[in-house]
């Protein structure tokens, strides 16, 4: 089972969504008559304004696998509350053996994140963020852990509603 790590490819479609292909793996299924080759693609899609989604597609040909992954990513999009091009607060995300730490950063810092995490932030439209991964560096697990962390983001309005206070009281 040879593994092909594809270069992250960016594409912007007519619907205004940014697409990035994170990886393409060649997979084999061994059967009585020999081997059957296939491909698995991992992609992320975002609108550059806080919406992001991840998709995984499998097929006998690379373009078909990528197409399936992009369609699935579009269906799985969700909104992340951003604050001035960065995150609301520091947060941890976990999936499988991958753990990620995501922290907001000051203007001018840029996206300090490795591989698959960088692709997620690029399609989301985050300009300043610091991210660190621990554990497994499997691209699928890293993307899922990053999305887990992003789902845990809460706005000051959310926290105020939970505590039964006003936003001004929360922000001090």
From Swiss-Prot:
Subunit text: Part of the 30S ribosomal subunit. Contacts proteins S4 and S8.
RNA-binding recorded as keyword: yes
Origin: domain of life: Bacteria
Keywords: Ribonucleoprotein, Ribosomal protein, RNA-binding, rRNA-binding
Listed GO CC annotations: small ribosomal subunit
Function: With S4 and S12 plays an important role in translational accuracy. Located at the back of the 30S subunit body where it stabilizes the conformation of the head with respect to the body.
Residue ranges of domain S5 DRBM in the record: 17-80
Protein name: Small ribosomal subunit protein uS5
Region forming the signal peptide: none
GO biological processes: translation
Pfam families linked: Ribosomal_S5, Ribosomal_S5_C
Lineage, broadest ranks: Bacteria, Pseudomonadati, Pseudomonadota, Betaproteobacteria, Burkholderiales
Family: Belongs to the universal ribosomal protein uS5 family.
Gene name for this UniProt entry: rpsE
Family annotation (SUPFAM superfamilies): dsRNA-binding domain-like, Ribosomal protein S5 domain 2-like
UniProt keyword annotation of Transferase present: no
UniProt xrefs under PANTHER family: MITOCHONDRIAL RIBOSOMAL PROTEIN S5
Domains as described in the record: The N-terminal domain interacts with the head of the 30S subunit; the C-terminal domain interacts with the body and contacts protein S4. The interaction surface between S4 and S5 is involved in control of translational fidelity.
Species of provenance: Burkholderia thailandensis (strain ATCC 700388 / DSM 13276 / CCUG 48851 / CIP 106301 / E264)
GO molecular function: rRNA binding; structural constituent of ribosome
């Amino acid at each position: 089972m040879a593994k092909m790590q594809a270069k992250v490819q960016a594409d912007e479609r007519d619907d205004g969504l940014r697409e990035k292909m994170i990886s393409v793996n060649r997979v084999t299924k061994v059967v009585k008559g020999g081997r059957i080759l296939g491909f698995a693609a991992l992609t992320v899609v975002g609108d550059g304004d806080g919406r992001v989604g991840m998709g995984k597609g499998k097929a006998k040909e690379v373009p078909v696998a990528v197409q399936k992954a992009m369609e699935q990513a579009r269906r799985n999009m969700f909104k992340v509350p951003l604050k001035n091009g960065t995150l609301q607060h520091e947060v941890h995300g976990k999936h499988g053996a991958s753990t990620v730490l995501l922290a907001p950063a000051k203007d001018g810092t840029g996206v300090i994140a490795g591989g698959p995490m960088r692709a997620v932030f690029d399609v989301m439209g985050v300009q300043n963020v610091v991210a660190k991964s621990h554990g497994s560096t499997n691209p699928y697990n890293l993307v899922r852990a990053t999305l887990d962390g992003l789902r845990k983001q809460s706005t000051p309005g959310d926290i105020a509603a939970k505590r039964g206070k006003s936003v001004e009281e929360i922000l001090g």
